Amino acid sequence: MAGQKIRIRLKAYDHEAIDASAKKIVETVTRTGARVVGPVPLPTEKNVYCVIRSPHKDKDSREHFEMRTHKRLIDILDPTPKTVDALMRIDLPASVDVNIQ
């Protein structure tokens, strides 16, 4: 697989879980002999939701909730078949969304 590249995008709401997953992927890939670029932190997506506190009146009293989505990008250069096999077997938390291109 010379000259090829695998791009992995990680998404999670918890920054500690995504950093631990990225570290685990980088360690696994370097152990198999491929080169790694990253993890590159991508901009955090912040969604803010405004909710009225009272169920029936007092519209001026509102509460704000926010949800942050953290993202990381990892590029694997010149992957070997051993690297691809190791990536398929790696165990990551369910809270981390992995997209492999």
UniProtKB/Swiss-Prot annotation:
Record PROSITE patterns: RIBOSOMAL_S10 (PS00361)
Keywords tagged on the record: Ribonucleoprotein, Ribosomal protein
Top-level taxon in the UniProt lineage: Bacteria
SUPFAM superfamilies, sorted: Ribosomal protein S10
One GO process term, biological-process aspect: translation
SMART domains from the UniProt entry: Ribosomal_S10
Any Gene Ontology CC annotation: ribonucleoprotein complex
Entries under InterPro entries matching the protein: Ribosomal_uS10 (IPR001848), Ribosomal_uS10_CS (IPR018268), Ribosomal_uS10_dom (IPR027486), Ribosomal_uS10_dom_sf (IPR036838)
Single annotated GO MF: structural constituent of ribosome
Family: Belongs to the universal ribosomal protein uS10 family.
Function: Involved in the binding of tRNA to the ribosomes.
Subunit structure: Part of the 30S ribosomal subunit.
Name of the protein in question: Small ribosomal subunit protein uS10
Organism whose genome encodes this protein: Corynebacterium urealyticum (strain ATCC 43042 / DSM 7109)
